[in-house]
Every structure is written in C-alpha cells, then in structure tokens.
Amino acid sequence: MSERMIELKGIVKRFYIGMPNELEILHGIDLEVKRGEFVSIVGSSGSGKTTMMNIIGILDRPTEGEYQLDGVDVAKAKDKELSLIRNQKIGFVFQTYNLIGRTSALKNVELPMLYAGIGRRERKERAKELLEMVGMEERLSHNPDELSGGQK
C-alpha cells in the first residue's frame, strides 16, 4: 500500500464564461498528502480553495494535470469506480451542513453508512459513538433546527 493517499501534479482548472473568455482558477497545483496526515487548505476568498477541494473530492475534474487517489488514476477511472471511491475513501463536511431537516442528528450521521452497505445495528452504534465523541450524546434525537450552528 502506497504511503501517498492524495497526489496532485500540475492541476489546472479553467471555467469558460462564453467564448473566448476563460477564467483559470487553479494554476498548476502540486500536492502530496500521505496516509494519516492532516492538511489544512487556507487562502483568501476567491483563491480556489473550494475548486481544489471539489477536485480532491471528485465532485469536479481538473482541466489539466494528474490526480492519484490511493493509487487510482482519477482521470482514467470510470464513473462507477469514482462513485465507489467517493463512498469509501472521501468524506466532506460542507460549510452549509447539508443535513436532512426532518431527520434526527443520529439518522443524519447514519445515512452515509447506509449507502456504504453497513448493517443497521452497526450504523446506529457507530453514529452514537461519533456523536458522543463531539459531545452530542444529549442531542441524538434532535433535528437540525434544534441544533446550534456548531452542533450542525
């Protein structure tokens, strides 16, 4: 198993805003993230952080460059393989939460595990553990509108 989990080489991302206009957001980004390593992406508003995270999270593709995720060449992977990778290897905490409004905190945490094919009992136990880890053991049955911004 490779030490490198994420490897970007020469990543360029351009958006086309009508011919001949184009807007280049990422200009040849190189990044290597090793297994178990924590990385922060920081920069001013409009600097391309979200664009880069969308590429890393396989929500978008680069215009140019190479992207290897855990040894898989993302550019050459088929859609079905990319869906599996997203489900098993990539996790996102979105700025806008994307929680299901009429669903408890526990069920919102369980949902990705359902898509991963994890059984009901294990999902519930793991979701409880995760919520307890962040001090939300008293909020398991609360819906998103009953949670603070930080709890969401």
Describe every region a protein language model picked out.
Residues 3-152:
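ABC family nucleotide-binding domain
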